[in-house]
Amino acid sequence: MKVRASVKKICVKCKIVKRKGIVRVICETPKHSQRQG
């Protein structure tokens, strides 16, 4: 899980999800998981 100011899709399987006002990127590759903060 990476915490970044700007979250972007890295690959085709990345999905942008909004949970409780937090923008997240969910992917099969754990390295691609991101959270905005």
Curated annotation (Swiss-Prot):
GO terms for molecular function: structural constituent of ribosome. SUPFAM superfamilies: Ribosomal protein L36. Pfam families: Ribosomal_L36. InterPro entries: Ribosomal_bL36 (IPR000473), Ribosomal_bL36_sp (IPR035977). Belongs to the bacterial ribosomal protein bL36 family. The keyword Nucleotide-binding does not apply. One of its GO terms (cellular component) is ribosome. The keyword Disulfide bond does not apply. Keywords: Ribonucleoprotein, Ribosomal protein. This is Large ribosomal subunit protein bL36. GO terms for biological process: translation.
